[in-house]
A protein has these predicted regions:
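C-terminal-of-GTPase-core extension/linker across diverse P-loop GTPases
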Residues: 199-215, 237
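Nucleotide-state-sensitive switch-loop elements of NTP-binding domains
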Residues: 1-18, 23-26, 31, 37-202, ...
């Protein structure tokens, strides 16, 4: 069963946006790096980027990439860890500039500056900053494949829902702005300069809406996007994954299949091994059977437990081979 993802990628060459989802610590980042390695070896220009504030791509590639934009790891393979703090500071600068441009203030009023500073400390601001950076990355369209190193399941659902929430919010604000303009025009109470300011605000809202729409349409496009759930042969993981799959379906995220990680080789059972390991193998056998019963043909690969951590390109290549088959 190893190497099953290679078949999916060959059968669906238009699926250029790749995501691995699952609970924390199951191997999502490792699989993301391995998929990027495989595709780069096929001559595709690939960007793997983390939307997790506690990103570990730097550790896996053994290279500091945090906050440095796309970093070339090897030919065709680029990796990026988004610096949310840097993005938030850029937000603040953009907000100040827009206030100057739209309202002609000589300086930002103290109460507005206080709000700008306070908003940066909001818990959701980090996720918002990362989301906006992802929109920039995707809209730019510089790569053949984009691989999202997602946060754990709960946060991933929040991230995936942000597009629809933002879209609805922008839609309402834009409608309100348009209504306000109509009332003001009917009252003939605005000057020429004011009309220009109103147009700038509407233009900005429409620009934001277009960016969000572009990103969200990719996430739910069955022809362009592949989403893989990562599971391991353990009871609670299977229960959580079933629940998560139902929730992801509500956001119309196209599920391409399941990948089973950390499978202890059954061949060990014929050796002189400790009793606890023999018990683990017996338990695993039952869970693997249950995985097959639950997910059937959607199980694309069983990845073995490796002898060491997956860090550095040689080990990433081993993982890529387990996922996709021989690397050419």
């Amino acid at each position: 069963m190893n190497g099953g993802l290679g078949r999916i990628f060959k059968e669906h060459p238009d699926r250029r946006y790749i995501m691995f989802g699952g609970k924390g610590g199951l191997g999502k980042t490792t699989f993301s790096a391995a998929a990027a390695y495989y595709l780069a070896k096929q001559g595709q220009r690939v960007l793997v980027f983390s939307v997790d504030p506690q990103a570990s791509l730097s550790d896996i590639f053994q290279q500091d990439i945090f906050g440095k934009g796309p970093v070339e790891i090897m030919p065709n393979l680029y990796a990026q860890e988004i610096d949310a703090d840097k993005r938030i500071k850029a937000y603040q600068g953009e907000i100040r500039k827009k206030i100057f441009d739209m309202y002609g203030f000589d300086k930002i009023p103290d109460e507005i500056e206080s709000y700008i500073q306070a908003a940066a400390a909001e818990p959701a601001m980090e996720e918002s900053a990362i989301f906006d950076e992802v929109v920039d990355i995707v809209v730019a369209g510089k790569y053949d494949y984009y691989i999202y190193d997602l946060v754990p399941l709960g946060h991933a659902l929040y991230y995936l829902s942000m597009a629809s929430v933002y879209d609805e919010w922008i839609e309402r604000i834009t409608k309100l702005r348009e209504d306000m303009r109509q009332y003001e025009e009917m009252a003939a109470a605005i000057s020429k300069d004011k009309e220009v300011e109103e147009d700038m605000i509407l233009k900005e809202l429409q620009y934001i809406k277009h960016r969000i729409s572009t990103s969200s349409s990719i996430l739910t496009d069955r022809h362009k996007t592949a989403f893989f759930f990562v599971v391991i042969p353990e009871e609670m993981i299977l229960i959580d994954t079933q629940k998560a799959a139902q929730l992801f379906a509500k956001f119309n995220v196209p599920l391409s299949g399941y990948v089973v990680n950390r499978v202890i080789p059954e061949s060990l059972a014929s050796l002189d091994i400790p009793e606890y390991l023999r018990n683990r193998l017996q338990m695993q056998k039952g869970y693997l059977k249950k995985i097959d019963e639950l997910f059937g043909a959607e199980v694309l690969a069983r990845v073995p437990e490796f002898e060491r951590d997956i860090t550095g390109l040689p080990m990433i290549e081993k993982m890529a081979t387990a996922l996709f088959g021989p690397i050419q």
